[in-house]
Amino acid sequence: MKEDCLPSSHVPISDSKSIQKSELLGLLKTYNCYHEGKSFQLRHREEEGTLIIEGLLNIAWGLRRPIRLQMQDDREQVHLPSTSWMPRRPSCPLKEPSPQNGNITAQGPSIQPVHKAESSTDSSGPLEEAEEAPQLMRTKSDASCMSQRRPKCRAPGEAQRIRRHRFSINGHFYNHKTSVFTPAYGSVTNVRVNSTMTTLQVLTLLLNKFRVEDGPSEFALYIVHESGERTKLKDCEYPLISRILHGPCEKIARIFLMEADLGVEVPHEVAQYIKFEMPVLDSFVEKLKEEEEREIIKLTMKFQALRLTMLQRLEQLVEAK
């Protein structure tokens, strides 16, 4: 079913399904009542007879493999003229301004590339790669009770090269040599979407938000139910509408970002057995085997009876000749 062929009283769920606008608005009202007083309430409007719903969509991380971050941001770097630099002693590193407030809050694994201006001393020749320590430095916000260590004295050129390819993820700095990151399984982030955005568009928006180098075709969105049932959202579906249809409570159903090749759909018939212990499942298997054996015996007896009837009929035909 194409969107152009839909009546104005219906809203598309996918390319082959739709829902009545009045029914969807009723579900939206329930959704907003559940999130009353919170930022997750959804707004709706109509444009040329088309219902558009927009707001924040929670997506949980369900990745098993690390994701690679982009080495450079899309934003243009700011180059300061050499006259603006004050003369410094060559044996001291460039100091970074410390945050005024030590407590920094972030929603989800926020990834921000850190760029510094290049000094005129580095523009005269090619930069050499500086060897990095395998351990990552922790920021002041992540370790409030850690004793502060005096930073090692570096040459200005070396310090500039280190800052140039550095990323910040929740206060942790990652160099481009180790710019891989695995979000905690089940941790939640959110993106602002609308009801006209397909699964592929939402994936692209989420990956761009965190500067993930991997393409959207390598990932998929799944609806994971409390029972263990897992359904993959097709590329033609609309995640925000799917969220409304499954209700506002994320304890019952959540949207997960998973790898396209590792995510597996779990139908309802299988999900109802997931939470049972192994001894109980073994007893189910034994019962099914017994039932299977009884069915085999019944079919065998039926086949033998039919075979005997056919043989008797053939003998009668031969005697008649």
From Swiss-Prot:
Segments of this protein annotated with the region Disordered: 79-159
Which residues are in the Ras-associating domain? 174-262
Q: Where is the SARAH domain?
A: 270-317
Please name the Gene3D superfamilies in this protein's record: Phosphatidylinositol 3-kinase Catalytic Subunit, Chain A, domain 1
Q: Which GO BP annotation is one of this protein's?
A: signal transduction
Q: In which tissues is it expressed?
A: Widely expressed. Frequently down-regulated in tumor cell lines.
Residues annotated with Phosphoserine modification: 141
Give the compositionally biased regions (Polar residues).
98-110
What Pfam family is a match, any one?
Nore1-SARAH
Which InterPro entries does the UniProt entry name for this protein?
RA_dom, RASSF1-6, RASSF4_RA, SARAH_dom, Ubiquitin-like_domsf
Q: Which SUPFAM superfamilies match?
A: Ubiquitin-like
Q: SMART domains from the xrefs?
A: RA (SM00314)
Per UniProt, the keywords (alphabetical) are: Cell cycle, Phosphoprotein, Tumor suppressor
Q: What does this protein do?
A: Potential tumor suppressor. May act as a KRAS effector protein. May promote apoptosis and cell cycle arrest.
Complexes and interactors: Interacts directly with activated KRAS in a GTP-dependent manner.
Q: Which PANTHER family match?
A: RAS ASSOCIATION DOMAIN-CONTAINING PROTEIN 4, RASSF
The protein in question is named Ras association domain-containing protein 4
Q: Which gene encodes it?
A: RASSF4
